[in-house]
């Protein structure tokens, strides 16, 4: 139950990040993700209780967990084409991000989470030997599962996603549950966690293609999904999450962008007669405005503040 707790909440965090390049990371997307996980767990608890009475054996439980691990490992590989098609379809019918993200989470993570949800009542049924200590047994098992969920939440958000990305985060949680499940099955089922481990070593594919140009860099930062798109003329755009807005622009032959960033060069002169001695940029992004100021006003001291340090590195 500890391993399943880790994987369940870890998958929830990773699922929300999986939605970000397509539907953003708004409260609506998070609400849909949490709601789908809770519904899937509820159905899993109910179904797991029935399965526990019909098949009160460890191999049956481990087989279910192993199947859930396989489904979880497949999620990042089917998400890009599926979510891209879903986004195009929902844009065509003007349904919006709420229905789009809800459908995406339902289709991708509901089934593996439901199957993991069967573990709690099933494991309690196997662990319970006497009615006298049934309450203590159930309480201990749920406590173990909850501690695992806490660990999975923090591991996904603070460690795995920033360090290895969303795809390998799903694979890591799938590997954890597959290893635990394989211990209760015959030796040949060890091939499943071995296969998942092999996928972990495989190169990470493109998270989301662009119809404007070539994606030359992608990153899952602590705060968001970021990518750099290079247009046919060499201009580069920094896009975050769903990419509806351009957050920074780079042109190889000029610091001017032809966009809103150029306005910051002249705005100080509405109240000053000379270039400012010092400016502060809150939300520096990839440094578009700072680069322009350094070119046109080299004597101006620039303080660029960006909460997401990886954008500065980009």
What are these model-derived regions, one by one?
Residues 249-264:
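Conserved SAM-binding loop and adjacent beta-strand
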